[in-house]
Amino acid sequence: MSNQDSWEDFCEQSELLPGEFLVREAGGAFVAVYNIDGLLYGVEDVCTHDGGELAGGPIEGFSIECLRHGAKFDLRTGAALCAPAHAPVPIWAVRVTQGKVQVRPR
């Protein structure tokens, strides 16, 4: 079985209400899962500009801003939306199964 097929338990669904996020270690990386209006999005918790954490940065629509230097990323695709970041942030697949939020690398 490849890593792409391996889902990991991340949290209970009840721990991640709309407007909230959680950061946990999964698959050897720190992953942030965001609940935006009931939809879940997962990204590695690292700015590709300088390696800082993304979690806790302001969210507007589907974009998150790094608090360190203002780089923005699309939570749906991982795309860098503005300088100083140019490389996308790795995204993680997220699903809910039997009340558990699960993640895996894409």
Name every feature range the model reports, one short phrase each.
Residues M1-G61, L75, P88-R106:
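N-terminal pre-ligand scaffold of iron-sulfur
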Residues K72:
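Short helix-to-coil "ATP-lid" hinge immediately C-terminal to the conserved N-box Asn in the Bergerat
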